[in-house]
Amino acid sequence: MAIALIFDCGATNLRTIAINEKGQILASHHLANNTKQGIESSDYHIWDIEEIWQKLTSCATQTLNQLMQQGIDLKDIVGISVTTFGVDGAPFDENDQQLYPIISWKCPRTIPVMENLSNQLDIKSLYQRNGIGQYSFNTLFKLHWLKTHKPDVFQKMAKFVFISSMLTQRLTGQFTTDHTMAGTSMMTNLTSGNWDPSILASLGLSNNHFPPMRYAGEKVGKLRTPLAQKWGLNPVPVISCGHDTQFAVFGSGAGLNQPVLSSGTWEILMARTQHAEPRFEFVSQGLTTEFDAQSNCFNPAVQWVGSGVIEWLGKLLFSDVYGSDHYYTTMIKEGEKAFNAGKRAVNFEGIFSQLGQGNISGLSMFATRGEIYVSALQHMANKLKNGLSVLHQVSQFQAKSLICVGGGSKNVLWNQIRANTLNLPIDVVDISESTVLGAAMFTFAGVGIYENVNAAQQAMQPTRKRIYPN
């Protein structure tokens, strides 16, 4: 048996997971993650890398103990990789010392920087080159903030290191840059697949300010001897992974030109394509394009608030069962009754995640809460249809099916409405850890357990349940 040990640094939880070459999770442990208050303002958010590292190493010890309790030989662990949220990182000096804390994606300090971007760069040209939408947490804005507000730090910066690579450096001693993390920064070029010289020049930086790029599946280095001895492991390879989103998509089993919907508080619709055409007219719809986990491929994506709206509605209309074991089943049961009844008058329009931008029409004294609930699900399905149309236009493909993962994929009524609205089959993936599975696929391919990552994906494919339009 071959085992991969995955370190996953999430915004909510820090975890280590041991998974075998068949995609089975053997052991795991997690601890809560949280931001700290910035020094300059109580509104600022930073990540404490020392605390994150201490918690992850503790998780690793617990996970390995679980394996030993099962009688599993720790020498079966053949590789390690790290996944994290995107964009965040920190500056280091020429002596490899961190100069400033990791500014969290939650921090509002970069909002004014984003709002002022048009005074420094051609926004349309920038977007067409790197494909990344204007989000205040983008790495570009963090570096601009450091340059303006911490010029001494910025001047001493010999390299900027993303958080995933800060962790792999502690595992191996080697500084690198995960390609999937670079692709979230707003500083890369979709055509070259590398850093964009003109964007870096606007900061007074060059490629030399970033450690060598590593593609997913490439070797970062070997596990440092002190850690190998501490954990009872061989000095196994540490394999580059990086941004969690890319590995969640790959772990779902998605091939090229296959859209994947991650349905949670936010719904994120992505595809794996060989074509990337960021069109500025779709910026308002949230179109962003990142590097895929595989080289020379891309992940165009659109997003909108999904279950967040449904939960708001549920609390209002189903308050009698909210918080009970019957909450979701009651909503779905009453929704199915309204759905099967056919014609509905209630209609949702607009954006319900913004103040005063959502509208509900067609209400009457005869409308049931089940009908209102179904109409909300239909509204979300319409957003999905519009989002898929955008991906079709910018990536030159026509979807034949849709993969659905995440908490919202467990709602059978919602899935049926999605299938009917798209007139496409929906494949619901039966896995809660698609990010970990995707990272393990690249890890096993990187150490030679599988010939390549496509073979790993095929062998470790999660099970699916297909729902057809009716």
Swiss-Prot record:
Pathway(s) annotated for this protein in UniProt: Carbohydrate degradation; L-fucose degradation; L-lactaldehyde and glycerone phosphate from L-fucose: step 2/3
A GO molecular-function annotation: glycerol kinase activity
UniProtKB keywords: ATP-binding, Carbohydrate metabolism, Fucose metabolism, Kinase, Nucleotide-binding, Transferase
Cofactor annotation: a divalent metal cation
Catalytic activity as recorded in UniProt: L-fuculose + ATP = L-fuculose 1-phosphate + ADP + H(+)
InterPro entries linked to this entry: ATPase_NBD, Carb_kinase_FGGY, Carb_kinase_FGGY_CS, FGGY_C, FGGY_Carb_Kinase, FGGY_N, Fuculokinase
Domain of life: Bacteria
Gene3D superfamilies on file: 3.30.420.40
GO terms of biological process kind: L-fucose catabolic process; rhamnose catabolic process
Enzyme Commission designation: 2.7.1.51
GO cellular component, one term: cytosol
S-S bonds: none
Coiled-coil spans in chain: none
HAMAP family per record: Fuculokinase
Function: Catalyzes the phosphorylation of L-fuculose.
Sequence similarity: Belongs to the FGGY kinase family.
Protein name (database record): L-fuculokinase
